[in-house]
């Protein structure tokens, strides 16, 4: 699942690698993994950072995180609850706890935690801004919330990952509401094992949000996305 090629200028590469929120993102200089579960540690021979959104089974696998960190010496960025669970297995200098509003850097890549509307202890979503300014919004398995409109207006996202299933209350319609509020260049339906749900999301986007493109991802396939011009 490693991405061998280097992204072109003003682009990033990504892979969706499970039925949940597992996304591998590669910028020109950094490799970032979000919410890895249901994969082997050797799937990620290179990593600069792992981002954890919350402690639920489909987002946090403590043993997997520990093994990847030992193999790659990467930084772990996690919500407070997940960070507490990892504090005895991850070196203190490699574990960064974040709450909504916190921002950190992985090299020249910015990672900003934002609110998450999901029934977990202290969940977050992540805005990932590449060194070229490509903006990705990883929304964990959040349901829509009003503040997304202001976040979208401020950030001008190139891509937003939108949950369409396998989470309390999540449907193609709630995923569309995230896209409607954030108005990205590209909306990606994920956190589902149903291609029917993904297609339903795409149909709503086409009808209701014509300025946003929908990318239905295949698992373990590499996609390139570019900066909004």
Which ranges hold each PLM region?
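Active-site metal-binding motif and surrounding structural segment of the metallo-beta-lactamase
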Residues: 38-82, 154-161
């Amino acid at each position: 699942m490693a991405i061998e090629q280097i992204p072109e200028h003003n682009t990033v590469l990504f892979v969706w690698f499970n039925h949940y929120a597992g996304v591998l993102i590669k910028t020109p200089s950094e490799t970032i993994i979000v919410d890895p579960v249901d994969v082997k540690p050797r799937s990620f021979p290179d990593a600069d950072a792992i981002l954890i959104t919350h402690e639920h089974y489909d987002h946090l696998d403590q043993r997997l995180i520990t093994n990847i960190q030992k193999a790659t010496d990467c930084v772990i960025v996690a919500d407070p609850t997940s960070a507490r669970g990892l504090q005895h297995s991850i070196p203190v200098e490699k574990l960064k706890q974040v709450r909504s509003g916190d921002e950190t850097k992985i090299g020249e890549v910015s990672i900003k935690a934002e609110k998450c509307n999901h029934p977990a202890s202290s969940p977050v979503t992540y805005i990932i801004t590449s060194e070229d300014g490509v903006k990705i919004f990883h929304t964990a398995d959040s349901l829509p919330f009003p503040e997304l409109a202001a976040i979208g207006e401020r950030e001008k996202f190139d891509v937003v990952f939108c949950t369409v299933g396998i989470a309390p209350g999540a449907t193609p319609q709630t995923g569309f509401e995230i896209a409607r509020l954030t108005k990205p260049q590209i909306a990606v339906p994920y956190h589902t094992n149903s291609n029917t749900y993904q297609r339903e999301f795409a149909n709503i986007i086409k009808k209701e949000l014509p300025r946003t493109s929908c990318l239905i991802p295949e698992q373990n396939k590499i996609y390139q996305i570019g900066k909004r011009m």
